[in-house]
Regions:
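Membrane-embedded architecture of ER/inner-membrane glycosylation machinery
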Residues: 2, 158, 272-520
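Membrane-integral, polyisoprenol-dependent glycosyltransferases
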Residues: 1-338, 360, 456, 505, ...
Length: 520
């Protein structure tokens, strides 16, 4: 098959992937704490008419460069103000763009069928389904970093540097460090460092700086060392050397992230990685080697880093998707041959996920029925996959059943399950309750640090931050002689109520574990 994807194939791909990513983005409140942070910052850019220095709670802060905020600002203005749809649409479109780039690149590097399947794999994973619906920076970084690395594969070096510059403007130095390290390791392993002479490295880095540096210079000139200490020190260096979440500091943390995040394709992942080494030849094997270095570097780097975030694994998704897509296309040429590795992997993963949905749903009463339905559907689809792979040895049928599994999982998760439990993970409802209630205007308001971005987003009231994990912070709340309210999570109140003088507080409202308390 020619390496040019037919228009019909691209349209079909965009319909499937677009549905998987866009469905339900306006049906669930923004989830605390990460999503509200970005939407609120964009709101404040508009409110203060200042688009270079980000603010939150009406004060400057130095968490991320501005590109994602600008995308949010454009979306909020387009839709006439804040809504869940306006806040999530930019991240969703960047995710779809990254899938499309991966598809086109794989088609040109391998074959049209390999490209088509690479896009379907990437676009129907649990990871892209979830992250593509989240109003956070990660899919924007994914778009630019994927663009940079794929441009290297296609020897489009000037475009590669341009993508790196935009990646730096999305999430900082990692935008050029990661592509640079992956490319260098690949050239080193293939003993082709001489290729760097054709890559215009020095002028290319100047282009990266021309795109990425002006904002940093502006921020330093206007905010001085506060910007350097917080952005470079805390949000970049410190996150590598010190854990943001101490309970996640395990070398194996990202293994379950990949296993669950690549579902429903996890069952064919190990086989594809192995086959890319043992069953590829010529230029194909060299291209696959680059993809192997890509995902291995990302996995090892973040496994070493002290701060662990699920979203960090998103950057390796294009590489693994292209490897799987290549292998699906290769295996379709072997129809009639039993793919034992895929059979075993599918049996294990579908069984685990099916049982997991059923058992997990029972942990929350509102999810019991939905979890049961999704669990049974997963087990049935797993059985059909085994039938296609084991009895009929039909690779393409099995692959399409995987696509169906991804879509069914997404529709159930975001059409049924998440709307039922959103109040457990979003302050939106309790914020509306606070705004509607009769309040004593003389009382001050404290807000749980975890909930504060969302509370500000949905009320425009910043409140006073209470770090409910800090005894010192809660003691300050206790010592404040004024009458007060505090919005915090129920389980944190029960854990820390002695530190904040629990006998002096009474519960006003409790919405799925997020509460308003009032001092007596």
């Amino acid at each position: 098959m020619m390496n040019q994807l037919p228009v019909k194939a691209i349209v079909l791909l965009l319909v499937i992937v677009g549905f998987n990513i866009l469905f339900g983005i306006d049906g669930v409140a923004l989830l605390d704490p990460d999503e509200p942070v970005y939407a609120e910052t964009a709101k404040e850019m508009i409110r203060f008419n200042e688009y270079l220095s980000p603010r939150i709670y009406n004060e400057y802060w130095y968490d991320k460069p501005p590109i994602f905020y600008w995308l949010l600002v454009g979306s909020l203005k387009l839709f006439g103000g804040f809504s869940e749809l306006a806040a999530r649409l930019p991240a969703s479109l960047m995710a779809i763009g990254a899938v499309l780039m991966t598809t086109v690149s794989a088609a040109r590097q391998f074959s049209a069928r390999a490209g088509f399947w690479s896009g379907l794999v990437m676009g129907t994973t649990v990871m892209i389904m979830y992250m593509g619906k989240a109003s956070v920076t990660d899919t924007t970084l994914l778009f630019f970093m994927t663009g940079a690395l794929l441009c290297f594969m296609h020897e489009k070096y000037w475009l590669m540097y341009l993508f790196c510059g935009f990646a730096v403007m999305t999430k900082g130095p990692i935008g050029v460090v990661f592509p640079g390290a992956i490319v260098f390791l690949y050239l080193l392993v293939t003993r082709n460092l001489g290729r760097m002479l054709r890559m215009h490295v020095i002028p290319g880095l100047i282009l990266v700086a021309a795109v990425g540096m002006p904002w940093y210079v502006f921020m330093y000139q206007n905010h001085g060392m506060d910007f350097i200490y917080e952005f470079i020190g805390f949000h970049n260096i410190s996150r590598f050397s010190a854990p943001l979440h101490p309970n996640r500091v395990h070398w194996w943390f990202y293994l379950p992230v990949i296993i669950l995040g690549l579902f429903p394709w996890t069952g064919v992942l190990l086989k594809s990685i192995k086959d890319a080494v043992t069953k590829s030849v010529g230029r194909e094997s060299t291209r696959l080697l680059f993809l192997q270095i890509w995902w291995i570097f990302v996995f090892i780097f973040f496994s070493i880093a002290k701060t662990k975030q699920v979203s960090y694994m998103l950057v390796l998704l294009p590489a693994l998707s292209m490897i799987i897509g290549w292998n699906i296309e290769r295996m379709t040429c072997e129809n009639g041959k039993c793919q034992t590795g895929w059979v075993i992997g599918t049996f294990v993963m579908y069984l685990l996920m099916g049982v997991g949905w059923i058992v997990g749903g029972r942990q929350m009463p509102e999810l019991a029925m939905g979890g049961m339905i999704l669990g049974v559907a997963t087990l049935v689809l797993g059985a059909l996959n085994l039938l296609a792979l084991k009895k009929y040895c039909n690779v393409e049928s099995a692959a399409w059943l995987h696509v169906v599994t991804g879509l069914v999982t997404m529709v159930m998760a975001f059409g049924v399950l998440m709307p039922q439990i959103q109040d457990r993970f979003s302050v939106k409802t309790i914020a509306a309750t606070y705004m509607a209630a009769e309040k004593d205007a003389s009382r001050v308001l404290y807000v749980d640090r975890f909930l504060r971005p969302g509370f500000m987003l949905y009320t425009d009231i910043p409140g006073i931050e209470a770090d409910v994990n800090s005894e010192k912070s809660l003691d300050a709340v206790k010592q404040d002689p004024r009458q007060k309210y505090i919005v915090m999570r129920e389980h944190m109140y029960e854990k820390m109520k002695e530190k904040m003088g629990g006998e002096n507080w009474e519960l006003l409202e409790n919405k799925s574990g997020i509460c308003i308390y009032r001092s007596r």
